[in-house]
């Protein structure tokens, strides 16, 4: 979805706002008093917008926060995605785009309160709802449960996070005014002992003096809330009155807030781009504010699920199926993926101003964008020439068993023909391409509810390869409890189990080790690269319509997945990935043309 006007390219792969910005050390006190929030003891209405800082290039945090102020907001809400800050168990990374403390300080510098949502479960259309992949390699561990292994891992994460943000909590003079416990648990289960465990983990980590809260759908409040803990409600446009009626009936003596007012929606691969009614949302949002309720716009800006961080939906009803989300988290939000105001911006800004009577600050200067010339990809390298040392296994195992988190994995065995019949792969996680002697014979997609394909093996010995991509672990619904990726079932050919396999983990962490580059055409799964001089680094999109399915790097940074089934056709190139000389790599299973567009 190309949200900025850019030509195609050819590529290688209180009701009032705070009067002035306060410093964290002098931030006003915040709390609750009966049915009202209070700031320095005075009634205060939260006007909030969601910004997932890990989805926004750090260089643009200030710009997005200034635009939140320009909308008329006084607060921002953000998740912290556990899988980014603890990619390997016990190895925490709060640097760069994971620097939550720096984001909070920048919000404070712009005069904005911060609502922090650490999870550990986030949902957010994010890979596994934020759970790190290494969790799913621990046997039959049960996430979102009282499994001691899960609770211990969650506690370690919260302890590490608390050290980063302790000085920024409101009771320490900082702008973090509220901290969420878990996330929409009522839509998942109703184990109140588990929720109590979560609250206890927050207290133990050092959030004991913070204003803790839960958020749930209006019909799930009884399942996901805790006594003596603030409850907020989440809902879609058109549901405001009924949702608040239910919240007030459930908790009549507490402040009234919508924790997520869904001012947009997310996209799935192979489905149309979400387009929602901006005018209806602005009118309903104004109604919410006129009732004196507090509100959080979800999303103010969606941003991008860079790398392999998009999630997937799969609920547990008979009509549902696995549905991976796109790399772009545009969300049809107030700002588009690249931070440009959409038509919703003016409508929401005017609605807020009519209620508050306050004229918000002006928007910052527009972001500079660039149109790049067509650039051919002159070099290619076959995946078959870039396989790692194989691991011998009797039957296929999920990638977590090999210490792998994301990317692809190849399974290989030898078959003696002639053979013909259905090749059963089972519950593929998530897309499998099948090759006989490195020639493609078909695919099996979880998204399409496929479990097998017909194959014909000629006489003699032949190599069977099954290349599996993890397209995004489930982030919502009960099926997220099993987050394994790759092949998880025995492979059968005409009902006979195939044994004696090799596994080749392909996490695709960097293009630096790719070998066998050639200027000749390469068939099958391959890498393609080219170099482009772009001058001063600015925003642009890479038009990937010339490719089939794959992902792209720019100067070693994984920009995310592309897929010609849409609706997303272009990848956002953040300026930190663009240099005067930029080298593009694209890894594809199929390429439609010998050149690409950007």
From Swiss-Prot:
Catalyzed reaction equations: Hydrolysis of terminal non-reducing beta-D-galactose residues in beta-D-galactosides
Keywords assigned by UniProt, alphabetized: Glycosidase, Hydrolase, Signal
One annotated GO molecular function: beta-galactosidase activity
Range of residues in the leader sequence: 1-21
Domain of life according to the entry: Bacteria
Active site: 184 (proton donor), 260 (nucleophile)
Alphabetized InterPro entries for the sequence: B-gal_1-like (IPR026283), BetaGal1-like_ABD1 (IPR048912), BetaGal_gal-bd (IPR048913), Galactose-bd-like_sf (IPR008979), Gly_Hdrlase_35_cat (IPR031330), Glyco_hydro_35_CS (IPR019801), Glycoside_Hdrlase_35 (IPR001944), Glycoside_hydrolase_SF (IPR017853)
pH profile of the protein: Optimum pH is 4.5.
EC number: 3.2.1.23
UniProt-listed GO biological process terms: carbohydrate metabolic process
Gene3D superfamilies documented for this protein: Galactose-binding domain-like, Glycosidases
Pfam family, any one: Glyco_hydro_35
Function of the protein: Preferentially hydrolyzes beta(1->3) galactosyl linkages over beta(1->4) linkages.
UniProt record similarity statement: Belongs to the glycosyl hydrolase 35 family.
Protein name stated in the entry: Beta-galactosidase
Organism: Xanthomonas manihotis
Lineage, opening ranks: Bacteria, Pseudomonadati, Pseudomonadota, Gammaproteobacteria, Lysobacterales
Gene: bga
